[in-house]
Amino acid sequence: MEIKVTEIRENKLLGRKEIYFDVLHEGEPTPSREAVKGKLVAMLDLDPNTTVIQYIRSYFGSNVSKGYAKAYETRERMLYIEPEYILVRDGLVQKQEE
């Protein structure tokens, strides 16, 4: 698996970096969110506790997936802005039982 960052935008209003990337996975299934997040965090020297993978999209017959991640400056900012289901899906918070 190889990750190529295509664009990084600085969003000062929301206190985050918006990262667009391509994942090359020749002869492999679409990589998991955890694998992509781990490699992206290591590549860009980000904090894994404030980085959220928004999506990874695969296209039929292609060995390249496109993704979008957000890296927040603080955990408080991330918890305020991101919907709970995305934080649960990325393993950053536990699902609250009603």
UniProtKB/Swiss-Prot annotation:
In alphabetical order, the GO MF annotations are: structural constituent of ribosome
Its encoding gene is what?
rps24e
What is the designated name of this protein? Small ribosomal subunit protein eS24
In terms of PROSITE patterns, this protein maps to: RIBOSOMAL_S24E
Question: What family does the entry list?
Answer: Belongs to the eukaryotic ribosomal protein eS24 family.
Q: Which Pfam families match?
A: Ribosomal_S24e
* Oligomeric and partner information: Part of the 30S ribosomal subunit.
Q: Does the keyword DNA repair apply?
A: no
Q: Which InterPro entries match?
A: Nucleotide-bd_a/b_plait_sf, Ribosomal_eS24, Ribosomal_eS24_CS, Ribosomal_uL23/eL15/eS24_sf
State the superkingdom. Answer: Archaea
Q: Gene3D superfamilies per the record?
A: 3.30.70.330
> Could you provide one GO biological process annotation from this protein's UniProt record?
translation
Q: Which UniProt keywords apply?
A: Ribonucleoprotein, Ribosomal protein
Mind telling me which GO cellular component terms the entry cites? Answer: ribonucleoprotein complex; ribosome
